[in-house]
Swiss-Prot record:
Cofactor, free-text remark: Binds 1 lipoyl cofactor covalently.
Cofactor(s) in the UniProt record: (R)-lipoate
Keyword Repressor: no
Subunit field text: The glycine cleavage system is composed of four proteins: P, T, L and H.
Lipoyl-binding domain location: 21-103
GO CC terms in record: cytosol; glycine cleavage complex
GO biological process, one term: glycine decarboxylation via glycine cleavage system
Species this chain originates from: Vibrio vulnificus (strain YJ016)
Database matches in NCBIfam families: gcvH, PRK01202.1
Family: Belongs to the GcvH family.
Coiled coil: none
Gene name of the encoded protein: gcvH
Function comment: The glycine cleavage system catalyzes the degradation of glycine. The H protein shuttles the methylamine group of glycine from the P protein to the T protein.
UniProt protein name: Glycine cleavage system H protein
């Protein structure tokens, strides 16, 4: 796992792209709990997402799970690959399985997220 990633309590990850945008996906732990992903509902380009609000849906053979925005901002890119290959979320949760890229409204929101070590400790306690 990339140690520069930040995480939420609800198992989303955020990668700071260093240009005012972030990439968002779901963690290895989340995809393991979901099982085989069969469908991903992607938000619209230019949609405004708000920290703590649902912006996407991931359906697996076991369940459908809302994906919550870790930060507030504007969707600048969606991972179209997931339309044809939703299994990328299982196979490469931190690489090919990313969901959206977002232009941050407030970069300080990143400070509210857990670092990789804190996140790993929290899931070990579950």
């Amino acid at each position: 796992m990339d140690k520069t990633l930040k995480f939420t309590e609800s198992h989303e990850w955020v990668r700071d792209n260093g240009d005012g945008t972030v990439t968002i996906g779901i963690s290895e732990h989340a995809q393991e709990m979901l099982g085989d992903v069969v469908f991903v509902e992607l938000p619209e380009l230019e949609a405004e997402i708000e920290a703590g609000e649902s912006f996407s849906l991931v359906e697996s053979v076991k369940a459908a799970s809302d994906i919550y925005a870790p930060v507030t901002g504007e969707v600048v890119e969606v991972n179209e690959e997931l339309s044809d290959s939703p299994e990328l979320i299982n196979e490469e949760p931190y690489e090919g399985g990313w969901i959206v890229k977002v232009k941050l409204s407030d970069p300080s929101e990143l400070d509210n997220l857990k670092d990789a070590e804190e996140y790993l400790n929290s899931i070990e306690e579950d």
